[in-house]
């Protein structure tokens, strides 16, 4: 009996020692996890300067927002069925390689209810009120990817010096103790120093950018780095950046177009309908230039001249259409007045002698008038004559004009027009009044003529 009791005590002591060892192992693991968390926190503080995507600063892990979804609808990552609340509880115990980079991990995304303001609820209680959301318009460049690679290499060196600890993504949870349950409810066995996780060691790509994150695996106590995947995917990242830029430009153009249509009130895509003809002409010219790139400059000039001639012909046709429309055999215009064919450029103050003055003049007077006009023209426009002779001729002409009273008063008035137009117009109006008064028909004669016309 005493031997059995001693054996039992020894077994109990051994079990206690084993438990103590396990506890020590767990404590060591917790210490290592805490160290890793501190390292990750430092990396996060360094890498928060450049944020290539929309991120939410929530704890350690930056995760994208999905706006407009309820909590009941949960978006899960690949090969992972854990809920959001469990992930929130397990974030403190998990080691995160992706925290060193600004690229969000392909883990679960946070969802929340849309904040709809009501009468009893303030607008400041929206979901975005308690979270710091940063928006970046620019897409990350190659410089950011190189910095990310450098930080990943530094972190890998730190992890390799930490007694071959297990490093995994947010979706993997591993413990060194045998048959210990994780917070996620998953068990993991260690056989021959190899880790058998439910999730694969390779990281799943992001939602749309096809980026691969660096990861560490422990095989027989040795750390294996996979940073070469990031180097291979730099080209893909550049292509995705170009596609993102094109998409952003298209989105901005569509927004501007919609806002302009709203301001215009039409809402149609064809804003300027009157410019369609001009656009067609421009397209035709571009096609002609493309088809005739090898043609000579002379042919192009000839084509341009032909186009100008055609345009002028069209303009002439339009001008003819815009002319006065005649009615009733061409005798009347739109104003119902008699058409008067007056050439442009004719000025009204030109001295036109009345028919009465012309009829009263004798042939001798007309000849004398012509001679005087010729003398005036010769004295003004000839340069061979001395100035003294010119003045003498002018004086003689003036004296002859004033002395010869046989010439009718119309010639005097016509010459006077070029000096004082107002007096000339007054004289012309007086002559017209005299003519009208002399040729007036009495009312009795007018009545007789009108009576005869009716008969």
Swiss-Prot record:
Bias kind Low complexity: ranges: 1-47, 79-103, 151-182, 192-250, 298-314
Disordered, as annotated region: 1-48, 77-250, 276-338, 383-407
Domain of life from the UniProt record: Eukaryota
Comp. bias (Polar residues): 119-146
Protein name: Putative uncharacterized protein DDB_G0274535
Organism of provenance: Dictyostelium discoideum
Lineage of the organism: Eukaryota, Amoebozoa, Evosea, Eumycetozoa, Dictyostelia
